[in-house]
Swiss-Prot record:
SMART domains: DSRM, RIBOc. It holds the Pfam family Ribonucleas_3_3. One of its GO terms (biological process) is rRNA processing. Mg(2+) binds at residues 60, 133, 136. Residues 18-147 form the RNase III domain. The active site is at residues 64, 136. Residues 173-242 form the DRBM domain. CDD domains: DSRM_RNAse_III_family, RIBOc. SUPFAM superfamilies: dsRNA-binding domain-like, RNase III domain-like. Its cofactor is Mg(2+). It is found in: Cytoplasm. This is Ribonuclease 3.
Length: 246
């Protein structure tokens, strides 16, 4: 087989993979070159003697800013009682490298990255920093191709549900949020109590209750007393938010 036919076969195989990705996420790029560029590492550009700006670094720069804005807007609307400091801490946990790597892996982004041979041989395809950069570059490409609304719809399918499911609850201090809200409104006194402790010593489960002036606001379950109280406070915040909206 000639080198030209080899190149054509590789090109078609690559395009098929990018088409699979678009089918998977329910998005069809108007400019497929942007999509491919989002997955093009600088090592591939250097090796194939392409123009420097054809790698994904500029798209990564843009995607980083778009991601920060969309996540900030979502958190601002989702957690109306959360302080600026808490919002900043939560956003940082969501857009940090380990988090973005998980989202990239969930979509098998690593399989699509175009790498130079040296980068491939040294495990670049699974390198966390590279995968996080690709995720940001993809966001940048999607923004350029279809605008902010398309980015938000994509994140509503991939990232925002994880926030709702509590994937980042370890950095969310619900007890402090609840305390600040109660103090601000002058509503009274919060009291926490452990209602139940069950399970063997190596696998304990606790049930906590939080009450305001003796009236129950939330029940939470956790592997520790602290975790159970945090979950109870989270439920209490949701209860108060629902009451505010009525």
């Amino acid at each position: 087989m000639s080198k030209q036919k080899d190149k054509e076969r590789i090109h078609e195989k690559r395009r098929a993979k990018f088409q699979e990705l678009q089918n998977k996420i329910g998005i069809t790029f108007r400019n497929e070159k942007l999509l491919i560029q989002a997955f093009t590492h600088s090592s591939y550009v250097n090796e194939h003697r392409r123009r420097l700006h054809e790698d994904n670094e500029r798209l990564e720069f843009l995607g980083d800013a778009v991601l920060e804005l969309t996540v900030s807007q979502y958190l601002f609307q989702k957690f109306p009682h959360m302080s600026e400091g808490q919002l900043t801490k939560l956003r940082a946990a969501i857009v940090c490298e380990p988090s973005l790597v998980k989202f990239a892996n969930a979509l098998s982004f690593g399989e699509l990255v175009l790498l130079g041979k040296g980068e491939e041989l040294t495990g670049g395809r699974t390198r966390p920093a590279l995968l996080a950069d690709v995720f940001e570059a993809f966001i940048g490409a999607l923004y350029l191709d279809q605008g902010m609304d398309a980015v938000i719809r994509f994140l509503e399918k991939t990232m925002f549900p994880k926030i709702d499911e509590g994937a980042f609850s370890h950095v969310m201090d619900f007890k402090s949020q609840l305390q600040e809200l109660v103090q601000r409104d002058g509503s009274g006194t919060l009291e926490y109590a452990i209602l139940e402790e069950k399970g063997p010593a190596h696998n304990k489960e606790f049930v906590a209750r939080v009450a305001l002036n003796g009236q129950e606001l939330g029940i939470g379950v956790g592997r520790s007393k602290k975790e159970a109280e945090q979950h109870a406070a989270q439920m209490a915040l949701e209860t108060l938010r629902a009451a505010d909206q009525q």
